[in-house]
């Protein structure tokens, strides 16, 4: 794997290779000394041109646990704020010694443009590009679901996909790169994905995606989902009114206490105890109630922890793809 740009690029075998490698990395993360020499002498640049907490810190931790040198770059205080182009920025970073560029960018398609441009020889990892994709978030979500499934079935994790799992993704699909990446990846791994959102928050062309669409969250909850993934409303990307009010959105599309109680009282298609997922940050009281956010059924912090292992796997595979992992 030379780059990681989109989950749509990943075959089932590719996705399982990342998840299986991440399991080996997770074993390292349980040690007292959480280090591997896999990327010693390599330089990873975190080029974040949009704000981030979880993803940036997770990639930094992942690279350092693989013994890489890490350079963190943000637009604020750099020449980007003076109008420097992406081409000049990345060529400067490669001249400094970047072997991999982990990039978050406000423009959809920016990561693929960089990888295909010939501007640099560095590996490119998409850490989120506009409303397009966020592949490592989808991979860590799949990793989390696979672990839950293995715990429920007692089966070996290695080589296991998500066949038969039912996952509902709820909320602002229109502006969500997480939703797009999850639809492609989860369907590739055999899961049944349903999008639940008002028509105003669904993108044009969604009917062609490998998923089902419903305009009723309550109907989606009645279909015995194994996981319900709540998405925040991305008000910063909205130029107009996409729903009447915050209160109306919560009543219709929020995981309220009543809906959460219904979810936890039932069983999923494969999991006896369905889970709530959230990529963060959570807007408590809007898309998710405080009780649901704080429940042990909420895997948000589990997802964050798993993200380090998954990103270790991704960095290893794009930079050392011809070598075996040795935990």
UniProtKB/Swiss-Prot annotation:
Its EC number is 2.1.3.2. It is an enzyme of class 2 (transferase). It catalyses: carbamoyl phosphate + L-aspartate = N-carbamoyl-L-aspartate + phosphate + H(+). GO terms for biological process: 'de novo' pyrimidine nucleobase biosynthetic process; 'de novo' UMP biosynthetic process; amino acid metabolic process. One of its GO terms (molecular function) is amino acid binding. Keywords: Pyrimidine biosynthesis, Transferase. One of its GO terms (cellular component) is cytosol. The keyword Transferase applies. Pathway: Pyrimidine metabolism; UMP biosynthesis via de novo pathway; (S)-dihydroorotate from bicarbonate: step 2/3. It comes from the Bacteria. Carbamoyl phosphate binds at residues 54-55, 104, 134, 137, 280-281. Belongs to the aspartate/ornithine carbamoyltransferase superfamily. ATCase family. NCBIfam families: asp_carb_tr (TIGR00670), PRK00856.1 (NF002032). Heterododecamer (2C3:3R2) of six catalytic PyrB chains organized as two trimers (C3), and six regulatory PyrI chains organized as three dimers (R2). Catalyzes the condensation of carbamoyl phosphate and aspartate to form carbamoyl aspartate and inorganic phosphate, the committed step in the de novo pyrimidine nucleotide biosynthesis pathway. This is Aspartate carbamoyltransferase catalytic subunit.
């Amino acid at each position: 794997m030379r780059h990681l740009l989109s989950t749509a690029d990943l075959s089932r075998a590719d996705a399982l290779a990342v998840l299986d490698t991440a399991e080996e990395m997770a074993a390292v993360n349980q040690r007292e000394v959480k280090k591997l020499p896999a990327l010693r002498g390599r330089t990873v640049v975190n080029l974040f041109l949009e704000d981030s907490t979880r993803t940036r810190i997770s990639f930094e931790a992942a690279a350092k646990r693989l013994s890489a040198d890490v350079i963190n770059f943000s637009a604020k205080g750099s020449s980007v704020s003076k109008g420097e182009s992406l081409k000049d920025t990345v060529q400067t970073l490669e001249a400094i010694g970047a072997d991999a560029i982990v990039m978050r960018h406000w423009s959809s398609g920016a990561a693929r443009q960089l990888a295909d441009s010939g501007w640099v020889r560095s590996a490119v990892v998409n850490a989120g590009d506009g409303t397009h994709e966020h592949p490592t978030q989808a991979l860590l979500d799949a990793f989390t679901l696979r672990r839950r499934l293995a715990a429920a079935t007692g089966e070996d994790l290695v080589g296991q996909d998500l066949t038969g799992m039912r996952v509902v993704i709820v909320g602002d699909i229109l502006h969500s790169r997480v939703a797009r990446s999850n639809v492609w990846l989860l369907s590739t791994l055999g899961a049944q994905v349903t999008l639940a959102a008002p028509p105003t928050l669904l993108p044009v062309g969604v009917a062609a995606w490998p998923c089902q669409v419903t305009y009723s969250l309550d109907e989606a909850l009645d279909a015995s989902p194994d996981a319900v993934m709540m998405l925040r409303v991305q008000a910063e990307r909205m130029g107009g009114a996409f729903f009447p009010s915050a209160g109306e959105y919560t009543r219709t599309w929020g995981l309220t206490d009543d809906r959460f109680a219904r979810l936890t009282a039932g069983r999923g298609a494969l999991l006896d105890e369905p889970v709530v997922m959230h990529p963060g940050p959570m807007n408590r009281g809007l898309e998710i109630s405080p009780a649901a956010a704080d429940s042990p059924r909420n895997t948000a912090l589990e997802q964050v922890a798993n993200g380090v292992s998954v990103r270790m796997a991704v960095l290893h595979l794009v930079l050392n793809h011809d070598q075996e992992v040795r935990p």
